[in-house]
From Swiss-Prot:
Belongs to the NifH/BchL/ChlL family. The modification ADP-ribosylarginine is found at R97. The key enzymatic reactions in nitrogen fixation are catalyzed by the nitrogenase complex, which has 2 components: the iron protein and the molybdenum-iron protein. Pfam families: Fer4_NifH. Keywords: 4Fe-4S, ADP-ribosylation, ATP-binding, Iron, Iron-sulfur, Metal-binding, Nitrogen fixation, Nucleotide-binding, Oxidoreductase. This is Nitrogenase iron protein. The reversible ADP-ribosylation of Arg-97 inactivates the nitrogenase reductase and regulates nitrogenase activity. Homodimer. One of its GO terms (molecular function) is nitrogenase activity. The keyword Ubl conjugation does not apply.
Length: 274
């Protein structure tokens, strides 16, 4: 079983990318579980066709300790298993703790047992790794491969670099490695070349360049992944290609994060900062 976490700046398209890629893996016959690690609880919406899933934390609050796996794990598109950790009420408590509680509960209830025959577990994790709870999938060895969703915008690259620092911090203890950067295009000038250069300097690969396409939004409005909503569309093939690349990926590295000056120089070199 491969344990993968998807990180990236808030709003970059992690949940969309994760669900569409998972749909591609499911189409290939892979058994996948998706664990949403975001208080918004939107990491499985497209796989479940818009069913607002009751989160692990909500279930615990309402049911107490008497929780069954079926209460928190729902089957979605292509036989994918979906769960959302959820979070505390706004303004109260720590969302990072929610992730820790949820993953521990899933383990206790046997979600990862061999009889489940899982090929993949995907953790879709909120934003930057600035809070210890959100770093938990990296820190405790729950995730072994990290893919960062990025774009050619400065803050997305800054966040990607920060996440690499988090990977370095826990590479020895948790055994986590960076599998690559997924460029989710925002149509910035020289975006592909810039992210390729960022990857080269960090010591990783741009595993896929995902073009910007309105079909993704159309599918989302219909509460589906692109592969589910319009399987013949070119964008569905892009997600299939990404799924195949992840499935075949052997390049797992400890990244070399850049200094801020190096990151800014990269932006200047490609004319973004002018």
């Amino acid at each position: 079983m491969r344990k993968i976490a998807i990180y990236g700046k808030g709003g970059i398209g992690k949940s969309t990318t994760t669900q569409n890629t998972v749909a591609g893996l499911a189409e290939m016959g892979k058994k996948v579980m998706v664990v949403g690690c975001d208080p918004k609880a939107d990491s499985t919406r497209l796989l479940l066709h818009g069913l607002a899933q009751k989160t692990v934390l909500d279930t615990l609050r309402e049911e107490g300790e008497d929780v069954e796996l079926d209460d928190i794990l729902k089957e979605g598109y292509g036989g994918t298993m979906c769960t959302e950790s959820g979070g505390p009420e706004p303004g109260v408590g720590c969302a990072g703790r929610g992730i820790i509680t949820s993953i521990n509960l899933l383990e206790q209830l046997g979600a990862y047992e061999e009889d489940k025959k899982l090929d993949y577990v995907f953790y879709d994790v909120l934003g930057d790794v600035v809070c210890g709870g959100f770093a938990m999938p990296i820190r405790d060895g729950k995730a072994e491969e990290i893919y960062i969703v990025c774009s050619g915008e400065m803050m997305a690259m800054y966040a990607a670099n920060n996440i690499c620092k988090g990977i370095v911090k826990y590479a020895d203890t948790g055994g986590v490695r960076l599998g690559g950067i997924i460029c989710n295009s925002r149509k910035v000038d020289f975006e592909k070349e810039m992210i390729e250069e960022l990857c080269r300097q960090i010591g990783t690969q741009m595993i896929h360049f995902m073009p910007r396409e309105n079909q993704v939004q159309r599918a989302e409005i219909n509460r589906k992944t692109v592969i589910d909503y319009s399987p013949e569309h070119a964008q569905a093939d892009e997600y299939r290609a990404l799924a195949k690349k992840i499935d075949e990926n052997k390049m797992l590295v400890i990244p070399k994060p850049l200094e801020i000056a190096q990151l800014e120089k990269l932006l200047v070199d490609f004319g973004i900062a002018n």
